[in-house]
C-alpha cells in the first residue's frame, strides 16, 4: 500500500467546484481532500486553508483561486475552488483554470439560486463539457419530497442551458457531516460516491498531442535557397516532414507542404505539441504568410469573423478602463499572436458595459481569424489589456 502514494501514473483530470455563495463549495472541497487523502494518500486541506486562496494574476486580471489535488482509485485530480463569485467569472472566461468537468454544488435547503444559474450559463459559454451535481446540506432537510423537488429544479435548470439534465448524476449528501467523519450515506459515503461518479462520468480529456496539428505563427523568415520558414510553439498535435498543412486566417486559406522542422538549430522529423519550432514551407513566398495566421492540419480549423463571446471587462483597479463602453465599441481583439480590430454589439436591453462587468457580446472582426468555440482572447486598446473573453458560439 505504501507504494501507492508515489504512483503518478494515473491520468490527470482538471475539475472545479461551482455554485451559489454559501452552498458549501469550499466545505465540499475540504471534505474531498480529507477523505481521499485517507484512502489514497495526499494532503488533506482544511476549510480555512482553501478559503484563504492566494491572489493570482492571469493576463493582468486579479483572481483568487485555491488549487488542491487528490487521488481517486483511478485518477489524479487537480481541483479549483474560488472564494468569490467574481473570481469564478474571471477564472472561467480567461481559462486560467481549464475544467474537464465541474462539480455543481446546490444547497438542498435552498435549491438553485441566481449564481447557480449564472455558473451553469458560464459553463455552457466557456465549454465546460461535463457537470456532476452535489446536493449539499442534506442533513438540514427532513422531507424526502423536498429533496426530490430540488433535484427536479436542478435538472430543469441544467436542461435549459443545453446540459443533459435528465442524465446528469446527482449525489445527495452533507459535506459538513463528511468532514466531521460521519460514516453515513450522506456523510463520508456520499463523498466517496461523488468521486467514483466523477471517475466514471467525466471522461479523460484528450491530450494536446492527440488533437489535430495547430501552430500559431509568430514570425516568418525567408532562407535563401531553402524557402520560407514560419516559427512558433506547436499548440496541439504533431507535424511531420512531408505532410500537407494549411495556412489559415487573415487571408484566403492556402495549402502547402512542410518540408522541414527545426528546433534549437537541429533538423527533426516532426514537431510535437509544446515544441518551439521553425517549419519550412514548400513554395510559399515570404509575403504570403504573416504573424497571426495559423499552420494547421488541413480541414481542421476555419477562419471566422463573427461570433458570440462571453467577456469580462477589467476593473479600473486591474488597470482596465475608467469609463463604460457602449454599442459599437471598437477595440482590438488579441488572438494567439496578433491584434485584429472588431466591433461589439451589446445584447438588447444593455445600454452600456461598466469596468468589472461580465457580458455577452457579438463581435464582428475586420479580418478573419482561425478559431473554434472555446478559444480565448484579450481585448486591448493601444496595447493595453482592458478585457478577456472566450468564443462561445461562432456565427459566421
Swiss-Prot record:
This entry carries the following GO cellular component terms, namely:
cytosol
What name has this protein been given in UniProt? Elongation factor Tu
Arranged from A to Z, the UniProt key words for this protein are:
Cytoplasm, Elongation factor, GTP-binding, Hydrolase, Magnesium, Metal-binding, Nucleotide-binding, Protein biosynthesis
Which of the seven top EC classes does this enzyme belong to?
A: hydrolase
| Species per Swiss-Prot/TrEMBL record | Legionella pneumophila (strain Lens)
Region: G1; residue ranges are 19-26
Using the UniProt annotation, give all residue ranges assigned to the region (G4): 136-139
Q: What is its main location?
A: cytoplasm
| tr-type G domain ranges (all copies) | 10-206
Residues the record lists as binding Mg(2+): 26
Chain's gene name? tuf1
Q: Where is this region: G5?
A: 174-176
What this protein catalyses is:
GTP + H2O = GDP + phosphate + H(+)
Q: What is the lineage of its organism?
A: Bacteria, Pseudomonadati, Pseudomonadota, Gammaproteobacteria, Legionellales
Q: What is its EC number?
A: 3.6.5.3
Amino acid at each position: 500500500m505504501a507504494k501507492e502514494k508515489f504512483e503518478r501514473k494515473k491520468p490527470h483530470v482538471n475539475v472545479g467546484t461551482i455554485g451559489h455563495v454559501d452552498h458549501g463549495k469550499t466545505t465540499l472541497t475540504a471534505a474531498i481532500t480529507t477523505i481521499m487523502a485517507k484512502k489514497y494518500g495526499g494532503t488533506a486541506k482544511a476549510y480555512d486553508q482553501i478559503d484563504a486562496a492566494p491572489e493570482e494574476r492571469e493576463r493582468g486580471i486579479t483572481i483568487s483561486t485555491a488549487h488542491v489535488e487528490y487521488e481517486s482509485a483511478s485518477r489524479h485530480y487537480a481541483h479549483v475552488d474560488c472564494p468569490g463569485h467574481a473570481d469564478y467569472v474571471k477564472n472561467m472566461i480567461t481559462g486560467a483554470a481549464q475544467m474537464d468537468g465541474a462539480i455543481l454544488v446546490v444547497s438542498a435547503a435552498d435549491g438553485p439560486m441566481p449564481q447557480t444559474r449564472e455558473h451553469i450559463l458560464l459553463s455552457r459559454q466557456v465549454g465546460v463539457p461535463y457537470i456532476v451535481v452535489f446536493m449539499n446540506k442534506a442533513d438540514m432537510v427532513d422531507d424526502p419530497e423536498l429533496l426530490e423537488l430540488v433535484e427536479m429544479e436542478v435538472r430543469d435548470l441544467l436542461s435549459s442551458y443545453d446540459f443533459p439534465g435528465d442524465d446528469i448524476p446527482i449525489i445527495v449528501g452533507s459535506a459538513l457531516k463528511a468532514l466531521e467523519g460521519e460514516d453515513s450515506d450522506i456523510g463520508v459515503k456520499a463523498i466517496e460516491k461523488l468521486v467514483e461518479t466523477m471517475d466514471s462520468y467525466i471522461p479523460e480529456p484528450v491530450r494536446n498531442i492527440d488533437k489535430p496539428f495547430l501552430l500559431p505563427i509568430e514570425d516568418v523568415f525567408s532562407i535563401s535557397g531553402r524557402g520560407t520558414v514560419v516559427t512558433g510553439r506547436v499548440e496541439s498535435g504533431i507535424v511531420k516532414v512531408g505532410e500537407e498543412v494549411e495556412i489559415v486566417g487573415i487571408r484566403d486559406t492556402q495549402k502547402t507542404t512542410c518540408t522541414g522542422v527545426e528546433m534549437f538549430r537541429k533538423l527533426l522529423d516532426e514537431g510535437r505539441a509544446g515544441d518551439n519550432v521553425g517549419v519550412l514551407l514548400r513554395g510559399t513566398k515570404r509575403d504570403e504568410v504573416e504573424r497571426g495566421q495559423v499552420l494547421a492540419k488541413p480541414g481542421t480549423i476555419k477562419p471566422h469573423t463573427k461570433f458570440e463571446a462571453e467577456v469580462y471587462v477589467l476593473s479600473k483597479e486591474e488597470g482596465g478602463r475608467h469609463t463604460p463602453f457602449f454599442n459599437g465599441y471598437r477595440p482590438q481583439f488579441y488572438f494567439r499572436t496578433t491584434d485584429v480590430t472588431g466591433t461589439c454589439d451589446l445584447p438588447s436591453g444593455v445600454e452600456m458595459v461598466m469596468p468589472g462587468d461580465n457580458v455577452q457580446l457579438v463581435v464582428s472582426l475586420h479580418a478573419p481569424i482561425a478559431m473554434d468555440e472555446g478559444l480565448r482572447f484579450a481585448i486591448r486598446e493601444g496595447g493595453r489589456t482592458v478585457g478577456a473573453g472566450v468564443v462561445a458560439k461562432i456565427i459566421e
